Amino acid sequence: MAVIIPEVFAVGVNKAMTSALRAGRIATDYTELVDDIRYCGNKVHFPVIDRISGASVLSDGGTVTFQRVSMTDNAATIKHVTNGVEILDRENVQVKAALKDAMAKQLGESLAQAVDSDIVSEILTNATYVDTVNSLDDAEVENAFVCFGDQRDAASMAGILINSRLAPHFMNMDGFVSATRTNTTNGNGVVVDGVLGYYSTIPVILSDNGTYKFTAGQNGGEDSSVADMIIVKKGAVGVVWQKEPTIEEARDIDKLGTKIAAQTLYAVKAVDLSGVSVLHVEL
């Protein structure tokens, strides 16, 4: 007898995974722009149109200069993430709807954590705008935006991803919590769905997946630790998803139980490094 209905269970896993994503929220979904991904190890191509050069002032009798539109092919490897649970027959009688929902939630969250870590790794490995500071305050956050020049409209930003160890630093910033500032948001500091608040209307998202590094001291030296703050513009980091997670159920007769596996395919690519700024904060 089936423990779950795979199609229904898949909806629950997908919902939980989408809700649990943190770094995934600052990545732009390119799924509808590419072909369906079907096989792990294959390549998926993120289409990016190259910027044309600046316009020129047309003189009397002059002609228009035409520039050919070109595209840069950003290929990424399709990856396979999976997790599973096993339910013994003697426990199955207790697996009511609420417990099945809990299983779907945990499976979805575990898939999300794996994808989040991969997105952060892609960013940290390829970022070109990187700085290291020994404290984090308003001035350092503003300096992290300098690399965007005059192209830093709040509406163009996907979000600010921070390790949870940096939350107290934001709570001490006037630019984040002061009621006298025009760029702050009421309720900042109250974490809702993983969002600490809004910095100049840009969501500040907490994520500990891949955003912290601890190094033990060598030969009696001091330990060191670094937490990351990552600013990403919309479209700078892309992700492609399989249409929905695949759920499979299999009977394990040796153990008198049932195994349930959840899996999905995805690909991640930093497609525009000019839209990414990374700040390593020494703690």
Model-identified regions with their sequence ranges:
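Extended, low-charge hydrophobic alpha-helical regions
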Residues: 76-93
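Extended oligomerization regions of viral-like shell subunits
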Residues: 45-48, 148-241
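Extended, compositionally biased alpha-helical segments that mediate assembly or anchoring
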Residues: 244-283
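Signature of extracytoplasmic/envelope-associated structural regions
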Residues: 3-5, 16-17, 21, 25, ...
